[in-house]
A protein has these predicted regions:
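Active-site rim helix/loop that mediates acceptor-substrate recognition in acyltransferases
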Residues: 1-26, 40-42, 189-191
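Local sequence-structure signature of Cys/Sec-based thiol-disulfide redox active-site neighborhoods
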Residues: 140-175
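Conserved acetyl-CoA binding element of GNAT-fold acetyltransferases
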Residues: 44-60
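Non-catalytic, surface beta->alpha helical segment in thiol-disulfide oxidoreductase systems
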Residues: 206-227
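Conserved beta-strand in the GNAT
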Residues: 24, 28-39, 52, 57
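Conserved GNAT acetyl-CoA-binding A-motif
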Residues: 79-98
């Protein structure tokens, strides 16, 4: 919807001063890459002097045409031009998971695993400078945990889908008497200390990390055991 897109655009606008680049190869947002200097990335990682890819998105109909390679090449070119140590990105261990990069594609492009989170999300990196310090997760991302019981969600406006679905999930939880707390992350400092490797959407249940996949109200109720 228009409001969803506005929330995302507003978030982007505020990041451009921090060095964020949004590069699109096809119209209407079907293929794009979004990256930012690691110092300003909204994730709990330690990696000074690198670029962090927030999102490398190629929609279904566009897959298989080399757009991912083209977008990644543009990011690599820019990183070299800026004299960065390399590029890092999140992916799931072993397989493609929703809202995360494809590990097989990254491996094929020369990325290696820099660090592993207990929840099966990896930080991958492509070094561009010799003897560059490897990026790594902060402890809060390496061992994701919260103290609260019930469902706890951390989310940002980086992905337009959160604007639409988070209130719907909140309503569904309230309606069914499900314990649910949502923490809307609105600044970099808070994002860099979230107790999860992903900050766009990190859902916990009874202290344990559950998923980075943005839930619809129906999906959420299924997770909560309500049919």
């Amino acid at each position: 919807s228009g409001k969803q897109a506005l929330a995302k655009k507003e978030w982007l606008k505020q990041r451009f001063d921090e060095g964020l680049v949004f590069y699109r190869s096809e119209e209407r947002g079907k293929c794009f890459i979004e990256y930012i200097p690691t110092e300003n990335a909204w994730v709990p990682i330690e990696a000074g002097g690198w670029l962090y890819i927030n999102c490398l998105w190629v929609s279904g109909s566009m897959k298989g045409h080399g757009y991912s390679s083209e977008l990644l090449s543009e990011c690599i070119r820019d990183a070299k031009e800026q004299g960065k140590k390399g590029i890092c990105i999140l992916c799931a261990e072993g397989r493609k998971r929703e809202f995360l990069a494809d590990p097989k594609f990254l491996k094929y492009k020369g990325f290696k695993v820099a660090d592993i989170s207990d929840c099966g999300i990896n930080l991958m990196y492509l070094p561009l400078a010799e003897n560059a310090d490897q990026p790594r997760f902060k402890d809060c991302a390496r061992h994701p945990k919260v103290s609260e019981t019930g469902f706890v969600l951390y989310y940002t406006d980086q992905c337009p889908f959160t604007y639409y679905w988070v209130p719907k999930v909140q309503e569904a939880a309230k309606e069914h008497g499900i314990s649910f707390q949502a923490f809307h992350i609105t600044d970099k400092e808070a994002a860099q200390n979230v107790p999860a490797p992903v900050t766009t959407y990190a859902l916990f249940r009874d202290g344990e990390f559950l998923t980075q996949g943005i839930q619809s109200d129906k999906k959420f109720l299924a997770l909560a055991g309500i049919k």
